[in-house]
Amino acid sequence: MTRQAAEVAKRRTFAIISHPDAGKTTITEKLLLMGKAIAVAGTVKSRKSDRHATSDWMEMEKQRGISITTSVMQFPYREHMINLLDTPGHEDFSEDTYRTLTAVDSALMVLDGGKGVEPRTIALMDVCRLRDTPIVSFINKLDRDIRDPIELLDEIEAVLKIKAAPITWPIGCYRDFKGVYHLADDYIIVYTAGHGHERTETKIIEKLDSDEARAHLGDEYERFLEQLELVQGACHEFNQQEFLDGQLTPVFFGTALGNFGVDHVLDAVVDWAPRPLPRVANERTVEPVEEKFSGFIFKIQANMDPKHRDRIAFMRICSGKYEKGMKMRHVRTGKDVRIGDALTFFSSEREQLEEAYAGDIIGLHNHGTIQIGDTFSEGETLGFTGIPHFAPELFRRVRLRDPLKSKQLRQGLQQLAEEGATQVFFPERSNDIILGAVGVLQFDVVASRLKEEYKVECSYEPITVYSARWIECSDKKKLEEFSNKAVENLALDGGGHLTYLAPTRVNLALMEERWPDVKFRATREHH
């Protein structure tokens, strides 16, 4: 095996998906602890703390104490190199969260055992389904009261339409939480709470049918056996291929706060989740072990560092090897650029990078020339697909405080749209400018960045738009007919693409029914 193939085989690139407050921050912290990336868990501090979490960047995040921005953390574990992409998990998240999922090979779904499947989890799973991303599941908070575990598995299957295969099974919960039982390998992992940065020694009881297990479970023993019978009768067995196809998720139980069960999940990512996968480009499929370098941009981040007024473009490497000072072609512009200062991400300790392989994420300094979806290569004309725009779910009309600044406003919005901070629409029948976003916070971010970076002050007004759909139609005559009929609701987006702004859900359904030859798309590829 070549050095490059060996490096690729070691890589695991995944993201965590969860509803806010299901425990994502805590589990991230414990995962970093396992990779000894942070000496003391707790660098990702609580909101009340005045020392800010290392992955909270922009000014506004400091005020709100949330990580709007998606950071990337790389750490070693069991002779593998783990790339963990953090997804903004606050009530207000953004299209970045969705796009981050296009750059990973697998995902870890964290559910709150007391609440089960929540709305944000459903939305994120829909995005994972676009690429059949393999999902590992962790049911968290067993140190509190949780719902019946069988009920939780049923809910995963019914709501998320994915088979659930329990790997471990909880013995009690809350004050009676005694650990988990490994279904396939017949042993108990005893629960001892490890607080903060303690890693407690794992105590294992071999075989459920043993005096030691009976003593540990006490009065619960018989009841646990009955429950197990139910579980083994009703649940799916783990199947590696179905997992890789995104049709089945292995389920683990534990408590991130008590530092219990998190290692089981990380082991599953190492043992079962795929190494960096081939990526589809318009021209061909690119294999990760190819010698020539290639990668795509999935996110652009403004001033990660208040001291450096720069933008960082996050690139997922798809093939080859990045070496410091190498030349690569920016395919969209046709220009060759020498990259001497790519960044690797170790939370916010920004480090200069010497080399990186397929599956790794690197940061390029961007002075406004790089856009989301851009491909970089060693000269070959490639355009990676699967980094879409997602239909916004919230809309506002923009109002300028100073009408003379409309040029700066358009310029600023164009730039912010290319960075993926918002989507901008220009209705065909009016001079309005409409912004679209996936999370409310995006509007605040845009307003504060327009003010700081473009010296433009704006306010927002509500507008009746339910959703946006990108219009495609191969029949020119039909498209013209449709455009004349629907002109009141048509707009061009920032890239000049025809978009239908549906005022209501009913209206959208009616239009789709009336115009069967017109495709109303909820995602649009970049470029």
Curated annotation (Swiss-Prot):
One of its GO terms (biological process) is regulation of translational termination. PROSITE patterns: G_TR_1, G_TR_2. Signal peptide: none annotated. GTP binds at residues 18-25, 86-90, 140-143. InterPro entries: EF-G-like_DII, EFG_III/V, G_TR_CS, P-loop_NTPase, PrfC, RF3_C, RF3_dom_3_sf, RF3_GTP-bd. GO terms for molecular function: GTP binding; GTPase activity; guanosine tetraphosphate binding; translation release factor activity, codon nonspecific; translation release factor activity, codon specific. One of its GO terms (cellular component) is cytosol. It is found in: Cytoplasm. Belongs to the TRAFAC class translation factor GTPase superfamily. Classic translation factor GTPase family. PrfC subfamily. PANTHER family: PEPTIDE CHAIN RELEASE FACTOR RF3. This is Peptide chain release factor 3. It comes from Pseudomonas fluorescens (strain Pf0-1).
